[in-house]
Amino acid sequence: MLIRNYRGLLGTKLGMTQVWDANNRVVPVTVIKAGPNVVTQVKTPDSDGYSAVQLGYGEVDPRKINKPARGHFATSGVTPRRHLVELRTADAGNYRPGQELTGEVFSAGTVVDVTGTSKGKGFAGVMKRHGFKGLGAGHGVERKHRSPGSVGGCATPGRVFKGLRMAGRMGHVRTTTSGLTIHAVDTERGYLLVRGAVPGPDGGLVLVRSAAKRPAPEAIAPAAELAGTGEEVSA
């Protein structure tokens, strides 16, 4: 069963730039507009069988929301959101529907995993898609230098095995880059500066969450302690 805490935010990748650290070394960073996210549902072991929190992000025209989704948002008392994500965390009981989350849930030096949809490359050959070496430049090879070569035997096995790497559409898949470090947090503008590159194009949706292969963060402050701080989002 779940035994650790997670923190996460949905955001938009704005692009890459470079900054200087305390030792005047250039650091390449990706700028992510993190949040604001709003809690749209809290799941507990008693009601749902597991502990999780559902976050909403992005504005959407209420007229484009179907009735089931409209009722879901009305139950939480929040305006409709374009994107939803569920984050399993042991401290889900400390959240409350309508609570607003910003980049302040992370701090500089935090190690995170960033998930997004990679850039689509279109139809690609095996050398670009899978890193094949290709065929030789000589020894009778003619106009087949970027070919995959043999894909199977003749009479035995007499077929092509499932999963054989071939040419095809490359990219535009859900991808996670693990173990990235947050260089800085701009709370005034809601920016996260993440060292290195993250998946997806500029303007793409990304999920920033606590690194799965690092020690778990401390539990978030209980929702009762946040009352009166202006974190309630009305419908």
Swiss-Prot record:
Family: Belongs to the universal ribosomal protein uL3 family.
Source organism superkingdom: Bacteria
InterPro entries for this protein: Ribosomal_uL3, Ribosomal_uL3_bac/org-type, Ribosomal_uL3_CS, Transl_B-barrel_sf
GO molecular function: rRNA binding; structural constituent of ribosome
Known partners and oligomeric status: Part of the 50S ribosomal subunit. Forms a cluster with proteins L14 and L19.
GO cellular component, one term: cytosolic large ribosomal subunit
Function per UniProt: One of the primary rRNA binding proteins, it binds directly near the 3'-end of the 23S rRNA, where it nucleates assembly of the 50S subunit.
Protein name: Large ribosomal subunit protein uL3
Keyword rRNA-binding set for record: yes
